[in-house]
UniProtKB/Swiss-Prot annotation:
Binds as a heterodimer with protein bS6 to the central domain of the 16S rRNA, where it helps stabilize the platform of the 30S subunit. SUPFAM superfamilies: Ribosomal protein S18. It comes from Streptomyces griseus subsp. griseus (strain JCM 4626 / CBS 651.72 / NBRC 13350 / KCC S-0626 / ISP 5235). PROSITE patterns: RIBOSOMAL_S18 (PS00057). This is Small ribosomal subunit protein bS18B. GO terms for cellular component: cytosolic small ribosomal subunit. Part of the 30S ribosomal subunit. Forms a tight heterodimer with protein bS6. Keywords: Ribonucleoprotein, Ribosomal protein, RNA-binding, rRNA-binding. NCBIfam families: S18. InterPro entries: Ribosomal_bS18, Ribosomal_bS18_CS, Ribosomal_bS18_sf. One of its GO terms (molecular function) is structural constituent of ribosome. The lineage of its organism: Bacteria, Bacillati, Actinomycetota, Actinomycetes, Kitasatosporales.
Length: 78
């Protein structure tokens, strides 16, 4: 018996490229929380759908935001 064809997952579109955003702001914590897991880790590019450059910008912004104490380094749940 032949296996049914496997569907390819839909390619995610970079949210920053779609909105034509030039700068990822480290002070915008509501936006940055979308790119952080519930454990406080930065989500992977294949999960978020960001392009390479914007994923780097998000990682830098999250790290700056953590340094400025706007975002936690880890989650509070234990």
């Amino acid at each position: 018996m032949a296996k049914p064809p496997v569907r390819k997952p839909k390619k995610k579109v970079c949210a920053f490229c779609k909105d034509k955003t030039q700068y990822v702001d480290y002070k915008d914590t509501n936006m940055l929380r979308k790119f952080i897991s519930d454990r406080g880790k930065i989500r992977a590019r294949r999960v978020t759908g960001n392009c390479t450059q914007h994923q780097r910008d998000v990682a830098t912004a999250v790290k700056n935001s953590r340094e400025m104490a706007l975002l936690p380094y880890t989650s509070t749940a234990r």
